[in-house]
Structures are given as structure tokens and as C-alpha cells.
């Protein structure tokens, strides 16, 4: 598995969406979960697969009408690494929010 060299907010959103699922998911569900455009999500999924973080397979449900869906799921190593990245992001966001709250004025007016 290759490391992700540029961890962007959209990449973290895709990782988080995949982590939130108990089973393989198709791209449209990732798009809906992240609120990101298909032109953002699918290249991220392709890159994650190329780097060994996730694997994909085609849904072979012959009873379901419509086009086949490509399903995405983590590799064993990818799931652990993704959890670490997403947890680190949450910790950083929480720390930034605490710092912002600590720096806010108390709401009291100071007069001279």
C-alpha cells in the first residue's frame, strides 16, 4: 500500500464515507455521503485503489435493473490507515474549534 502524499479535505471525506459503511458501497453512495461532485469522488476512488487502500468489484446482482454498479471497499491495511487519518483530522478540527472558542471575546463590552 502506498501512502497518500496529498491528503485533501475531499479525500478525507471519501475515506470517512467508506469507513461509515459496514459493506462495500458504490460510488453514488459515496457522492451522496460526502456532498462532493462525481468529478471529485471518482478520481479519488481510482487513486485510492491504485495505491492499494481500497479494492473494487462489479456488482453482479442480475435481479437489480439498471447498469452494473462498481463496489468499493477497504483492503485490510487501507482500513486501518484510513481510520488513523480520519481520526487525526477530527482531532485537529476539535483542537482548532477549542482554540477558536478560547480566543473569542466574552461578550462583555469594554468602555474607557
Feature-to-residue mapping (PLM):
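Short beta-strand "wing" residues that participate in macromolecule-binding interfaces
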Residues: 56
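N-terminal compositionally biased, intrinsically disordered segments and leader/signal-like regions
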Residues: 35, 76, 110-112
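N-terminal helix-turn-helix DNA-binding core of bacterial DNA-binding proteins
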Residues: 2-42
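Short, hydrophobic-biased segments on the C-terminal half of alpha helices
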Residues: 45-49
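Basic, amphipathic "hinge/linker" alpha-helix immediately C-terminal to the N-terminal HTH DNA-binding motif
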Residues: 63-86
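Glycine-centered, phosphate/nucleic-acid-interacting loop/turn motifs that mediate DNA/RNA or nucleotide
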Residues: 52
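Amphipathic alpha-helical dimerization/coiled-coil segments
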Residues: 80-112
Amino acid at each position: 500500500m502506498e501512502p497518500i502524499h496529498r491528503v485533501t479535505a475531499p479525500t478525507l471525506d471519501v475515506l470517512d464515507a467508506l469507513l461509515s459503511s459496514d459493506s462495500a458501497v458504490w460510488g453514488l453512495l459515496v457522492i451522496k455521503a460526502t456532498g462532493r461532485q462525481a468529478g471529485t469522488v471518482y478520481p479519488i476512488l481510482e487513486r485510492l485503489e491504485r495505491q492499494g487502500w481500497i479494492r473494487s468489484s462489479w456488482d453482479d446482482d442480475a435481479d437489480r435493473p439498471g447498469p452494473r454498479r462498481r463496489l468499493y471497499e477497504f483492503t485490510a491495511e487501507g482500513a486501518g490507515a484510513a481510520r488513523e487519518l480520519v481520526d487525526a483530522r477530527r482531532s485537529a478540527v476539535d483542537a482548532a474549534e477549542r482554540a477558536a472558542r478560547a480566543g473569542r471575546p466574552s461578550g462583555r463590552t469594554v468602555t474607557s
